[in-house]
């Protein structure tokens, strides 16, 4: 064991906070984009909020693809630097940028092609349909800057620099926050663009993040650089990038399919129900994914001590992380339960939305603790090289248990059944996660 490494000797509790604070802030900033957009757009009309809500699965899938390439590049560069293979690390940087631009352009084109049939399947309201097209036609162009800035962020983080990438993320969020009201409502010299203004502000935020990311990458002090001289495309390296980032893509993409599936149930009730779920889900994502930043900080600690054969510190990190995650999820649950009306007011909720939305938020918030526990167990499996078990838990959470629960409870309790499906699915997932963990312990492989 490397006794001079802080992963091996630092107090576990203090180490988790040190490793978690930046990912936690990063996740909070990343998921504040959609919440800010929705909060301002809701002041235009409920139909505008519904349009943004219908667009959310597409933008989520785009983000998942960005994370796919970003994580793959991150893991590959970190490995090469650890092996002191500087040239291979620089070659990976160039491949990552080419993939970010190429895949980003492809997704831009695909989103423009599918958005008409996609929105047509989810709403019969002509105004919502047109607003959705208007919003997504601009947001489609966010994919290249989004994918490039996330790729560069992960490249720089692979060198051990966790702080600098956070600043260009903050800059993008600030631009989005400032320009949203200016462009949506036409304040001062800015034109009133309505829902188009929200999408323009989002793209502007990502563009600034990309420009600052490039400036940072091209700086003299960076440990990795873009390789141009004697560069040639390596198919094996591209395949490794995609393979290494695939688990992260699956975990992030599942929420996109889940939201689309829920919307297909909600469309049978009302557009207000879709607008509500879109607003609520952004609040939930902000809470859950911020906590996920804490979990990300636990992962390298558990992974290091598993590799070092230090089972006591591995289990200590898992227990301490589980306690912190539970505490934060309970805090999130209490916040939603005590302040549902105030949270809905962020989205200028109509009386019709409030009539079912307040109780619906309280029902769905009951799932947070179970979600946190199952995600922590899934991360433990990821750290101990049991990727199959890790992915199985994520599939249970957002697909295998949720879909049947939605179908059955919708039949039994109508609209309330849809909200009940979330805590039911999360509880079942947590039980399965505990059973899988007990099985691994019984086999003495944990």
Which residues fall in each region the model found?
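Hydrophobic transmembrane alpha-helices of multi-pass small-molecule transporters
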Residues: 61-64, 176-180, 210-214, 286-289, ...
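Short runs within selected transmembrane alpha-helices of multi-pass transporters and secretion channels
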Residues: 70, 139-157, 165-173, 198-213, ...
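Short alpha-helical transmembrane segments in multi-pass integral membrane proteins
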Residues: 1-23, 77-144, 190-246, 302-367, ...
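Transmembrane helical elements of multi-pass membrane transporters/channels
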Residues: 18-37, 138, 149, 172, ...
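Helix-terminus/linker motif at the lipid-water interface of multi-pass membrane proteins
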Residues: 32-50, 119-126, 182-193, 253-286, ...
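Small-residue-rich hydrophobic transmembrane alpha-helices
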Residues: 49-109, 146-165, 276-334, 338-340, ...
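Structural signal for membrane-spanning alpha-helices in multi-pass inner-membrane proteins
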Residues: 111, 154, 180, 184, ...
């Amino acid at each position: 064991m490397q006794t001079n490494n802080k992963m091996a000797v630092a107090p576990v509790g203090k180490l988790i906070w040190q490793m978690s604070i930046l990912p936690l802030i990063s996740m909070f900033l990343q998921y504040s984009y959609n919440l800010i957009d929705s909060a301002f757009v809701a002041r235009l009309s409920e139909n505008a909020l519904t349009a943004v809500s219908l667009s959310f699965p597409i933008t989520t899938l785009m983000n998942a693809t960005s994370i796919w390439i970003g994580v793959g590049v991150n893991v590959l560069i970190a490995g090469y630097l650890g092996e002191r293979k500087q040239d291979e690390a620089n070659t990976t940087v160039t491949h990552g940028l080419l993939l970010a631009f190429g895949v980003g352009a492809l997704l831009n084109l695909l989103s423009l092609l599918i958005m008409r049939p996609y929105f047509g399947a989810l709403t019969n309201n002509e105004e919502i349909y047109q607003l959705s097209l208007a919003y997504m036609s601009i947001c489609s162009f966010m994919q290249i800057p989004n994918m490039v800035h996330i790729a560069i962020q992960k490249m720089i983080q692979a060198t051990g620099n966790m702080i600098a990438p956070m600043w260009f993320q903050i800059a993008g969020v600030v631009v989005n926050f400032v320009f949203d009201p200016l462009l949506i409502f036409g304040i001062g010299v800015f034109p009133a663009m309505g829902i188009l203004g929200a999408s323009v502000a989002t793209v502007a935020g990502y563009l600034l993040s990309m420009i600052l990311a490039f400036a940072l990458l091209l700086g003299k002090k960076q440990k990795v650089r873009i390789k141009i001289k004697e560069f040639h495309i390596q198919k094996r390296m591209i395949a490794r990038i995609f393979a290494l980032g695939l688990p992260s893509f699956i975990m992030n993409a599942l929420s996109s399919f889940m939201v689309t599936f829920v919307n297909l149930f909600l469309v049978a009730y009302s557009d207000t129900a879709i607008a509500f779920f879109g607003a609520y889900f952004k609040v939930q994502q902000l809470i859950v994914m911020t906590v996920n930043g804490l979990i990300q900080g636990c992962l390298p600690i558990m992974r290091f001590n598993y590799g070092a054969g230090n089972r006591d510190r591995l289990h200590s990190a898992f227990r301490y992380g589980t306690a912190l995650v539970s505490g934060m999820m309970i805090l999130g649950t209490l916040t939603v339960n005590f302040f549902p009306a105030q949270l809905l007011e962020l989205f200028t909720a109509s009386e019709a939305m409030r009539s079912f939305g307040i109780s619906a938020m309280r029902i769905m918030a009951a799932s947070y603790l179970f979600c946190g526990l199952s995600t922590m167990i899934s991360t433990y499996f990821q750290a101990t090289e049991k990727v199959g078990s890790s992915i199985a838990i994520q599939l249970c959470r957002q697909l295998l248990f949720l879909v049947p629960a939605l179908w059955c409870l919708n039949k039994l309790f109508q609209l309330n059944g849809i909200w009940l499906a979330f805590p039911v699915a999360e509880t079942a997932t947590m039980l399965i996660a505990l059973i899988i963990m007990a099985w691994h312990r019984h086999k003495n492989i944990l």
